[in-house]
Regions:
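A cross-kingdom feature that marks ATP-driven nucleic-acid transaction machinery
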Residues: 309, 315-410
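Phosphate-binding site recognition
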Residues: 1-341
Length: 410
């Protein structure tokens, strides 16, 4: 058996985010950076690749773990980096005091990098984590010039409530916010080219239709297999890794997840979108809470709002998450035992219809790239949709235009 050398992963895209991190390293102040984005988007990968895993301290929160156990792991992490045996911490104030003490032993002429990943998992019920973090930042780190604290986590609700929109001691303390979006089609092509995949551009377009450019989903694919074989492997085999992804996707991100699922399901049933008033009527959600749900879903790229042509004050919300759309169409409520269902049904009318609708959505998601290809990226434009309801009385059919680009100079 020949020895093989594992090729290290390559950081695709993320140019703006890397530029921001470089600015943090060069600034003359301490930086509190939060890295946001949906589950599987590559938050940890970005930070690890940029810093080449060279941290002065790093810690990963543990899922559904009691406070004292989290504190014990935190103590072990400080012991690993400092080389000094740690006592048992009574609370998070003790833990951050120990972190301060260790960091003060490091050279003063460089930035110290602290990476706390899965931060929402650390904040267990009745823990003192957030208040201790506030004390650490306001009372010590923010008064220095050499600290870069990076906080990351998939739980969007927590990141928004506790950090971004914090009304307490962390109010307006975040110095940089990195929001990671899914790969574009171009970045997805770059990803496959990075290991000499034989997939054609049409193949890559089809891959985008069910992965939506989510890096982790792309990483599960076998680039030497056909698109159909990959779909069977990812969704229809007995141990298919993405078959159960939906069960965790939203619950990992949001509290009150049932309300989020209500919005997702009603938007799936109305593929061309609903206004906020229509969503409220269908889900019985309203007011500030509905605004929060819609904002968080938009933040994670699950939904988008579009203007209706000629009605600039009317926003329509549409489900745009490619994985969720694929799951509802072909996986949910289906109990087919065929492990190669996709390969056996390539001419299925449902697949053809899905591909048509999904291609429209890809165009909407890439309207900036389309404008650039048309040579109008430097001109002010608005992107909207247009629809005309059928007039049954006069036997006039309805019509829809999925993407209208209106130039401001015409």
């Amino acid at each position: 058996m020949e020895n093989t050398v594992q090729i290290p992963p390559v950081l695709i895209g993320r140019h703006d985010e890397c530029a921001t991190l470089k600015e943090c390293m060069a600034s003359n102040r301490s930086e509190f950076v939060i890295v946001c984005g949906r589950r599987r988007i590559g938050k940890t990968f970005l930070v690890d690749q940029f810093f080449e895993n060279r941290y002065d301290f790093s810690f990963v929160g543990k899922h559904k773990t009691k406070t004292q156990t989290q504190l014990n792991y935190f103590a072990k992490a400080i012991q690993k980096y400092s080389g000094q045996k740690q006592k048992t911490y009574a609370d998070w104030y003790d833990a951050f005091d120990a972190l301060e003490y260790y960091l003060e032993t490091l050279p003063v002429n460089r930035k110290k990098i602290i990476f706390i990943d899965e931060m929402p998992w650390i904040d267990t019920q009745r823990s003192t984590f957030v208040s201790a973090l506030e004390n650490f930042w306001n009372g010590w780190a923010n008064r220095r010039y050499d600290i870069v604290l990076i906080a990351s986590g998939s739980a969007t609700s927590w990141m928004a409530d506790k950090l971004i929109d914090n009304q307490g001691g962390l109010h307006n303390r975040i110095t940089r916010r990195l929001y990671l979006e899914p790969f574009t089609l171009s970045e997805t092509e770059e990803y496959f080219k990075s290991f000499d995949s034989p997939l054609t551009r049409y193949d890559i377009l089809q891959c985008y239709m069910f992965t939506g450019g989510i890096p982790f989903y792309l990483s599960l694919m076998n680039p030497q297999m056909s698109v159909a074989q990959n779909i069977d492997m990812l969704f229809f085999h007995k141990s298919a890794p993405l078959r159960r992804e939906y069960d965790e996707l939203y619950s990992a991100l949001f509290t009150h997840v049932d309300s989020y699922i209500k919005v997702i399901e009603i938007l799936y049933d109305h593929k061309y979108g609903l206004t906020k008033r229509e969503i409220s009527k269908a889900t019985k959600l309203n007011g500030t809470f509905l605004n929060t749900v819609l904002n968080n879903l938009e933040l994670c790229d699950f939904i988008e709002n579009f203007e209706l042509f000629g009605k600039k004050n009317t926003l329509v919300y549409r489900l745009v998450d490619f994985y969720t759309l694929f799951y509802f169409k072909f996986i949910a409520n289906r109990h087919n035992k065929d492990t190669e269902w996709w390969s056996h049904n390539l001419d299925d009318a449902g697949i053809r219809a899905w591909m048509g609708l999904t291609f429209e959505l890809i165009c909407m998601k890439h309207h900036k790239q389309i404008k650039k290809a048309l040579g109008i990226s430097g001109i002010g434009t608005s992107v909207s949709t247009w629809k005309c309801l059928p007039d049954t009385e006069n036997e006039i059919p309805g019509a829809q235009i999925d993407m209208l680009i209106e130039r401001s100079d015409k």
